[in-house]
Amino acid sequence: MLKFSFLFLTVEKPGGLFDFDGTLPLIAIQFLILMFLLNILLYTPLLKIIDERSEYIANNLQEASIILNKANELSSQYEKEFSKIKKEVELDSLTLQNLHKNILEIEIISSQKIFENYLNQTINNFDSEKEKILTSLDEEINSLSSEIITKIVA
């Protein structure tokens, strides 16, 4: 018969995979050391960069909100100035329209007076010419009627 004693030497100890001898705590310690090293070497710089970036973004957002507030203030100020200037322009426009209307009325009245003076002068000239012509016709009629009477009587 064969001796199976060498088989007993190679057989695993009882407990197998879940044996709690010195290797499990050693692996746990190695895991904790690795985790600590990874935290120091990788995660801390990464978290530092993330925090810096977050702070940078927060600062930029704060600056942007300040700029936006200033822009809104300037916009409202410009809108107020624009409405004020628009009212002034409308007032100036009305003033200019009234002034133009008054000047036009004055010119029309002046033109009417000139026309009336010219018309009165023309009518007066016409009346004086009419009187001259009527007087001259009256004289001619008198002279012709005297000639006719003298020719009839003669």
From Swiss-Prot:
The organism is Vaucheria litorea
Q: Is-annotated flag, keyword Nucleus?
A: no
Q: Write out the entry's keywords from A to Z.
A: ATP synthesis, CF(0), Chloroplast, Hydrogen ion transport, Ion transport, Membrane, Plastid, Thylakoid, Transmembrane, Transmembrane helix, Transport
Task of the protein = F(1)F(0) ATP synthase produces ATP from ADP in the presence of a proton or sodium gradient. F-type ATPases consist of two structural domains, F(1) containing the extramembraneous catalytic core and F(0) containing the membrane proton channel, linked together by a central stalk and a peripheral stalk. During catalysis, ATP synthesis in the catalytic domain of F(1) is coupled via a rotary mechanism of the central stalk subunits to proton translocation.
CDD domains, per this entry? ATP-synt_Fo_b
Which PANTHER family does this UniProt record tie to the protein?
A: ATP SYNTHASE SUBUNIT B', CHLOROPLASTIC
More info:
In plastids the F-type ATPase is also known as CF(1)CF(0).
What does the subunit comment say?
F-type ATPases have 2 components, F(1) - the catalytic core - and F(0) - the membrane proton channel. F(1) has five subunits: alpha(3), beta(3), gamma(1), delta(1), epsilon(1). F(0) has four main subunits: a(1), b(1), b'(1) and c(10-14). The alpha and beta chains form an alternating ring which encloses part of the gamma chain. F(1) is attached to F(0) by a central stalk formed by the gamma and epsilon chains, while a peripheral stalk is formed by the delta, b and b' chains.
GO CC, any one term: chloroplast thylakoid membrane
Q: Which family does it belong to?
A: Belongs to the ATPase B chain family.
| Membrane disposition | Single-pass membrane protein
Report the locations given in the UniProt record: Plastid, Chloroplast thylakoid membrane
Name listed for the protein in its UniProt record: ATP synthase subunit b', chloroplastic
